């Protein structure tokens, strides 16, 4: 009986071992783990379709997409939860605060680009990181400048949608 239990521990196909955490790429020297979460096809699909890892995008396009998303979602908490939330100027205050935060984040990205960041390494979730992005100071600076443009654009879009919500609802019923 004990031999059967010991033998089953070494079989990845044994149903009792399906949710066991394995070393990444079955190599314990890498210092990374392959878990049911980060090795699942859904996680891999989601992460690999984010702008940072999607193949074939220039650093400027990546920065624009990431900036648009961040500017859009940063606007909401500032406008609806900020200190001016119950005033007529809440949306304008949210827009200005979101733009201010995007400018600060762009400065942080620029500082990071000047620190000579390491290249992306393959991992369980992203086995083939894009080689054309984030590999030089210039690509990081292109990403940061496009992030600024996209972030301001995303905040402005969110501002116009929120400020004109009554008109938009009237158009669509």
UniProtKB/Swiss-Prot annotation:
One of its GO terms (biological process) is photosynthesis. Keywords: Membrane, Photosynthesis, Photosystem I, Thylakoid, Transmembrane, Transmembrane helix. It comes from Nostoc punctiforme (strain ATCC 29133 / PCC 73102). This is Photosystem I reaction center subunit XI. It comes from the Bacteria. It is a multi-pass membrane protein. PANTHER family: PHOTOSYSTEM I REACTION CENTER SUBUNIT XI, CHLOROPLASTIC. One of its GO terms (cellular component) is photosystem I reaction center. Its main location: membrane. It holds the Pfam family PsaL. It is found in: Cellular thylakoid membrane. SUPFAM superfamilies: Photosystem I reaction center subunit XI, PsaL. Belongs to the PsaL family.
